[in-house]
Design a protein with these regions (language model features):
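Regulatory and interdomain segments flanking nucleotide-handling catalytic cores
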Residues: 1-218
Length: 218
């Protein structure tokens, strides 16, 4: 019997194109955010968040349930760049001891996540999935829809989308320094009710108890 986990790997889109000062600033902000991420999702973590490369980080989850929330908190907290969030489902080949961070571990779940990350980058997706059995194709189809919609928006609309996915209109208005009516107008132009409906289905695919999730398998 092997225990199945979800490895999550996040990386910045086109980070090498960032100016040196901007990339250094992002890396500092990421390092300062990691302790908050570990506190916020401590009950869902099999192994803690940690930075692997300069602007890439990993964590190991016991189930896929927090993926949606993690992705959108990251996109909002570190919203000056775009992030690819890749998830791989599988087992570990290294011992899992208390206090270990995700980059200290290895196994099929991480291989699946790494492959999903490379495919997502190649196909300009903001999500990538591997190892989820029959659900993998559907999850990546939703990732394609989500990403195509995002890239079709203007930079201002993209920022609004990040905020709307994590907050209410009042907080979005404060962040954008506009009125709530301006936020409503922007949301209408983005067909936000349809976007939200699509998001709900995508989210449900990740959290549905009947979908593949962490647990013992033979």
């Amino acid at each position: 019997m092997a225990t199945i986990y979800i490895a999550l790997v996040a990386d910045v889109v086109a980070s090498r194109g960032l100016p040196t000062a901007a990339r250094a600033r992002l890396q500092r902000r990421l390092l300062s955010a990691i302790p908050d991420f570990n506190r916020r999702w401590r009950k869902a973590l099999a192994a803690r968040f940690a930075v692997t490369l300069g602007d890439e980080f990993q964590c190991l989850l016991t189930s896929p349930a927090p993926i949606w929330e993690i992705a959108h908190v990251v996109r909002t907290t570190l919203g000056e760049v775009d992030w690819v969030i890749a998830c791989g489902r599988g087992s570990l080949t290294t011992p899992l001891a208390a206090g270990r961070t995700a980059p200290e571990l290895d196994g099929p779940c991480f291989h699946e996540a790494r492959g999903a990350l490379e495919t997502a980058k190649r196909k300009h997706r903001l999500f990538g999935f591997g190892g989820f059995g029959a659900a993998t194709t559907t999850l990546n189809a939703f990732a394609s829809y989500y990403s195509a919609l995002y890239w079709s928006w203007t930079p201002r609309q993209r920022r609004a989308a990040k905020l709307l996915r994590c907050g209410d209109p009042a907080s979005v208005a404060a962040a954008l320094k506009v009125s709530q009516s301006a936020v409503s107008h922007l949301a209408r132009r983005m067909a936000w009710p349809l976007v939200s409906a699509g998001d709900s289905i995508f989210h449900a695919m990740l959290t549905d108890p009947h979908s593949p999730s962490a647990g013992p398998v033979s």
